[in-house]
A protein has these predicted regions:
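Hydrophobic "lid"/C-terminal helical patch
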Residues: 4, 37, 75, 102, ...
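Conserved catalytic core of Hanks-type protein kinase domains
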Residues: 27, 78, 96
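Active-site acidic short loop of glycosyltransferases
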Residues: 53-54, 80-81
Length: 117
């Protein structure tokens, strides 16, 4: 889990939230991680994404190594009316690396989409 959580931050282990994430990840053991990965193999919801009819915000860090950028783009292209946002100089932990920017983007999205509710 240490190697994985290192990739969640552009700064790697020197990021202030790295120790917290590393500790949280220690609860997972190798066997359970393998079972999760096997369960996900071959599973896809791509054919059902077009059924989503709720406002959807997709946020990805431009330096995310945990999820492929193409996965986020695929979500954006297949969820009708979705909004796609790339946070600069962020990895998988974009919400921890740039919390002010992340919160502004989420807040603006919620305000915009709550107008009609």
């Amino acid at each position: 889990t240490e190697r994985t959580s290192e990739t969640w931050f552009v700064e790697g282990p020197s990021h202030p939230y790295y120790p917290m994430c590393r500790e949280a990840g220690r609860g997972a053991n190798k066997e359970s991680c393998i079972k999760v990965m096997r369960a996900m193999q071959g599973w896809s919801s791509l054919d059902r994404l077009s059924e989503l009819d709720l406002p959807t915000l997709i946020i990805v860090g431009d330096k995310d190594r945990s999820t492929k950028p193409s996965d986020s783009i695929m979500l954006w292209e297949n969820i009708p009316g979705s909004v796609f946002c790339v946070l600069p100089d962020c990895a998988h932990g974009a919400h921890l690396e740039k919390p002010d920017l992340f919160n502004k983007i989420v807040g603006d999205f919620l305000i915009e989409h709550m107008k009609d509710r």
